Amino acid sequence: MDDLVFAGNKALYLVLILSGWPTIVATIIGLLVGLFQTVTQLQEQTLPFGIKLLGVCLCLFLLSGWYGEVLLSYGRQVIFLALAKG
């Protein structure tokens, strides 16, 4: 039972860590674009969306190798825990 709780806890932690970086990037880009729009009095609605989309895609592309390593390591841990119990 403790192993199941450990695996669930680790999964929630990984979701928090892995989703944190794109969220931080989108927030920073949104603030910068909003500041730019305020200073220039630009009223374009789709500008922040497009720039945030590009920023998050770039972030996911750059971190994809690390994401793969982390998820593969977690999958191995869960499989080893399951095999040790069974």
Swiss-Prot record:
Disulfide pattern:
none
| Record's bilayer topology term | Multi-pass membrane protein
Q: Which GO terms describe its cellular component?
A: plasma membrane
Q: Where are the transmembrane segments?
A: 16-36, 53-73
Source taxon at top rank: Bacteria
The record's section on InterPro entries has:
Bac_export_3, T3SS_HrpO
Q: What effect is documented for mutating I28V?
A: In strain: s3041 / Serovar V and s3044 /Serovar V
Q: Which Pfam families match?
A: Bac_export_3
Explain the purpose of this protein: Involved in a secretory pathway responsible for the surface presentation of determinants needed for the entry of Salmonella species into mammalian cells.
- By what name is this protein known? Surface presentation of antigens protein SpaQ
Species, as recorded: Salmonella enteritidis
